[in-house]
UniProtKB/Swiss-Prot annotation:
Keyword Flavoprotein (UniProt): no
Residues involved in GTP binding: 54-61, 118-122, 172-175
GO biological process terms held by the UniProt record: mitochondrial genome maintenance; mitochondrial translation; regulation of mitochondrial membrane potential; ribosome disassembly
Name of the protein this chain belongs to: Ribosome-releasing factor 2, mitochondrial
GO MF entry, a single one: GTP binding
Keyword Mitochondrion: yes
HAMAP family xref list: mEF_G_2
Entry keywords, A to Z: GTP-binding, Mitochondrion, Nucleotide-binding, Protein biosynthesis
InterPro entries to which the protein is assigned, alphabetical: EFG2, EFG_II, EFG_III, EFG_III/V, EFG_V, EFG_V-like, EFTu-like_2, G_TR_CS
GO CC, any one term: mitochondrion
Naturally occurring in which organism (per UniProt): Debaryomyces hansenii (strain ATCC 36239 / CBS 767 / BCRC 21394 / JCM 1990 / NBRC 0083 / IGC 2968)
Length: 860
């Protein structure tokens, strides 16, 4: 570590080749190179779609604000603490200082365009991250240099890894006490299971008080020292550059660190890239002589292949290190032309039962059909050999107070143009696309078109498009869609089951309509929010992903939307199920002489619905949301109905498929109304439709008649069973897989607390690194890679000792017992313990715990 003044003091805009060009405010290079009006016309090869992902409070929004400022998109830097950031624009976000909704924004940089999505870091909003990752080509993972790799970082990293998304790591908060760049790099290798190349490393200066101060970075690729002006009024644009090769005699320690970092980089890249080996041999086997262009190309190839992760460092809050990170986005992350082809299938709705007859509506199978895909080197993805076919995925819907419903989408092929016709392949409905927008946080910009590889917004769709819908268009050409095009399905977005409930009710009857309207808006925006109604209590039950999730929902209802409502505390989401099979049939009928009727029976199962034997039966329909199954037995459909179809005597206004769907929907409604003992929705339950009748030659009855009788039949069966055999029903509770990360000296006390207070079942206790498949590789890799000294960790001679001293406890825990666990864990571990949870499934509540839960809800 060297105390030095700058050799060259220049105010410049950092570029990947370190050209020295003016970067003073008012002479914005990005604006000069790429005007705002031309931003939307940037070709796909100069476009990047990135997400900012991390654990909460790692600095995602702070980093994004600097990117906006340095690109010339904003005139001042927003501050999370002051609540004036561009991407956190919801009142709840600004009040709490956290990101709740992912926000999209587009910036220019080095004649390129970067579409950025800033995602939440709190575990309750993981679904926001999940649906954002579906439309991203790459991501920047931000890590807190003090905390290292945290639980949520590990979780979202694995999500991105499963999708094959290339990543860059940015070690933030290097200015903080206790910041450990090298320790964090070791954790990246160990916990995230990735090779790394250090593209820059921290630079420290030691003033007279002998406390190291983070001042800049050593650029390993270009062999330069970049030092930022740290005056209180500096905004990060005043940077001095020192050429370490020219000044190696004056700065031998810095030069040696860069040399060792380069050597490690070349060794890592050379394991998979022969061009590096060739260049090394051509340059006298001197690591420092390998050209920057050769290294850049190799790093990009390795990043795109998920072979390596480029690592950068900085302090976004202190305006240090962000510009090199932005260059890395352009240099190392893929354009839409370089990313992998998305998962696309052609898929139409499936008929509920096999039927014959010329009059029935024809439906294709639900089995995915291969779709011809190719990548045009200039325009990008081409689907079904049709370069004029536009496809887009709707990944987010919001309701703006003045602009109405706004649907965020990613265009995958073709060009989406305003004033043309689009089709929603889920509904088959055609819509007139009037206006297209690009979003700048909360501010829209109207554009005439949005081309492949870009993210935009459609306004004015109301309820016609929801999250996960695929949109197709032929652009200005008004031609019909063929069967394959009209049933395309892109990148299905899985919605996790809600785990917490909270009840809400209007203060007066006059407040009901407005409250219901507000709830519908929230449901449209957030597919992870579920709503049901307790008819006995007259309460609306909101179900969400966590306590904070529901608290934010309630805040939005009452504070933002001005709904007059009474709110209850957040509680765990329980379910009911049959404790044992019940083969007793129940018949329900209506109309003259029972001409509309149904016969059903009920059963139950353990585990996931799709894995049960019931799911393999003919006519089985799996209801994934509540893990239920409805079986419409093939023999249940009356023969006279099929005869009426064959002989063209079908007089009903409804097709046979519509009638069958009504039967199923009636069953679904009844199951959601709740069980007879606890009043919770039924789960892991089978409804078997054994027989049903409907007068096909009558105009007096419709599909609603069938929906009503199936609902009443299931409701009656549940009620009768509850009155005659209360013990037949069991209470189910959510069980979580919990991972607790601690130091070994806290192991005994934490295990005791988990098993006694949390009622946990311990499944394993290991060294933290032993949970990784490639333990030996991770240890060897972290030992092999050069990392610079951590000046804030002088007493740690062997970082491996610290890593190996950490334990991970894996346990299955009832969710109810984990409420408030974090504060207890921190108390036990002196603030060093952390944990994360993932949903395993629903399990029957054991008798020893049933009484306390029953008392909580005033049962029995």
């Amino acid at each position: 570590m060297t105390n030095t003044g700058p050799i060259v003091r220049r105010v410049f805009r950092y570029a990947s080749v370190l050209d020295t060009i003016c970067y003073k405010r008012g002479i914005h290079s990005s604006r000069a190179l790429l005007s705002e009006s031309r931003l939307n016309s940037v070709p796909p090869d100069r476009t990047r779609n990135i997400g900012i992902i991390a654990h909460i409070d790692a600095g995602k929004t702070t980093t994004t604000e600097r990117m906006l400022f340095y690109s010339g998109k904003t005139r001042r830097i927003g501050n999370v603490d002051e609540g004036d950031t561009v991407t956190d624009y919801l009142p709840s976000e600004r009040e709490r200082g956290i990101t709740i909704q992912s926000a999209a924004i587009t910036i220019p940089w080095n004649k390129n365009k970067i579409n950025i999505i800033d995602t939440p870091g709190h575990a309750d909003f993981t679904f926001e991250v999940t649906r954002s990752l579906r439309v991203l080509d790459s991501c920047v993972t931000i890590l807190d240099a003090v905390a290292g790799v945290e639980a949520q970082t590990e979780k979202v990293w694995k999500q991105a890894q499963a999708l094959g998304i290339p990543k860059i790591a940015y070690v933030n908060k290097m200015d903080r006490d206790g910041a450990g760049f090298s320790r964090t790099v070791k954790e990246i290798i160990q916990k995230l299971q990735t090779r790394v190349v250090l593209c820059n490393i921290p630079y420290w200066e030691t003033p007279v008080n002998d406390v190291p101060i983070f001042k800049g970075v050593l650029d390993v690729l270009n062999k330069k020292l970049l030092k930022w002006n740290s005056d209180s009024n500096a905004n990060g644009t005043d940077i001095s550059v020192t050429d370490l090769e020219k000044e190696m005699d004056k700065y031998p320690e810095l030069y040696e660190m860069v040399s060792k970092s380069r050597e490690s980089m070349v060794e890592t890249l050379g394991e998979f890239d022969e061009t590096i080996i060739d260049s090394f041999l051509e340059n006298d086997e001197d690591y420092m002589k390998i050209p920057v262009a050769v290294l850049n190309s190799a790093i990009k190839r390795g990043t795109l292949a998920n072979y390596v992760t480029p690592v950068f460092c900085g302090s976004s809050f202190r305006n240090i290190g962000v510009q090199p990170l932005m260059d890395a986005v352009v240099n190392f992350l893929p354009s839409p032309l370089e990313t992998k082809v998305p998962d696309i299938s052609s898929n139409a709705p499936k008929a509920l039962a096999k039927m014959k007859g010329k009059n029935r509506k024809k439906k294709v199978t639900s089995e995915p059909t291969d779709v011809p895909l190719s990548m045009d080197p200039k325009h990008g993805l081409v689907i079904n050999k049709n370069p004029n076919l536009t496809t887009a995925l709707a990944f987010k819907v919001i309701t703006h107070p003045t602009r109405g419903v706004m649907t965020f989408f990613r265009v995958y092929s073709g060009k989406l143009t305003s004033n043309t016709t689009i089709m929603n392949t889920r509904t088959g409905k055609k819509l007139n696309l009037r206006k297209l927008l690009l979003m700048h946080g909360d501010e829209p910009e109207v554009v005439p078109s949005i081309s492949a590889g870009n993210i935009g917004v459609i306004s004015g769709t109301d309820d016609d498009i929801v999250t996960g819908d695929t949109i197709v268009s032929h652009g200005p050409v008004n031609k019909p869609f063929n069967d394959l095009e009209s049933s395309l399905k892109m990148l299905p977005i899985e919605i996790p089951p809600p785990l917490f409930n909270s009840s809400i009710e209007p203060l007066t009857a006059g407040d009901t309509r407005h409250l219901n309207s507000c709830i519908q808006i929230l449901l449209r925006e957030d597919p992870s929010l579920k709503v049901s109604v307790d008819e006995d209590l007259g309460q609306i039950i909101l179900s969400g992903m966590g306590e904070l999730h529901l608290e934010i929902i309630k805040e939005r209802l009452v504070t933002d939307m001005k709904a007059n409502a009474r709110l209850r505390d957040v509680a765990v989401s329980y379910k009911e199920t049959l404790g044992k099979p019940n083969y007793k049939s129940v018949t329900q009928s209506t109309g003259d002489n029972g001409c509309v009727s149904i016969e059903i029976s009920m059963d139950s199962f353990e585990g996931l619905a799709e894995e049960s034997s019931f799911a393999d039966e003919d006519g089985a329909i799996v209801l994934e949301h509540e893990n239920n199954i409805v079986i419409l037995e093939p023999s249940a459909t009356p023969e006279y109905m099929q005869t009426a179809i064959d002989e063209r005597r079908w007089k009903s206004d409804h097709s046979l498929e519509d009638l069958q769907e009504s039967l199923v929907h009636g069953c679904i409604t009844a199951l959601q109304l709740g069980g007879p003992v606890f009043g919770f929705a039924l789960h892991s339950t089978v409804i078997r439709i054994k027989n049903w009748h409907f007068p096909v030659d009558s105009k007096d009855y419709n599909s609603s008649s069938l929906l009503d009788i199936s609902r009443r039949a299931v409701t009656k069966n549940i009620k009768d069973l509850g009155e005659s055999e209360k013990d037949l029903f069991s209470l189910l509770e959510p069980i979580m897989q919990t991972k607790v990360y601690i130091n070994s000296d806290s192991l005994g006390e934490v295990v005791h607390d988990l098993t006694h207070r949390c009622q946990a079942t311990i499944t394993s206790i290991d060294d933290e690194s032993e949970n990784m498949d490639a333990l030996n590789w991770a240890n060897e890799e972290s030992e092999r890679v050069y990392v610079p000294p951590d000046y804030t960790m002088k007493n740690t001679n062997n970082l491996q000792v610290e890593l190996r001293n950490k334990k991970v406890i894996v346990a299955e825990t009832p969710l109810r017992e984990m409420i408030g666990y974090l504060s207890r864990l921190r108390s036990i571990t002196q603030g060093r313990g952390v944990f994360d949870m993932s949903y395993l499934g629903m399990k029957r509540v054991i008798k020893s715990r049933l009484a306390s839960i029953s008392n909580e809800f005033n049962f029995m």
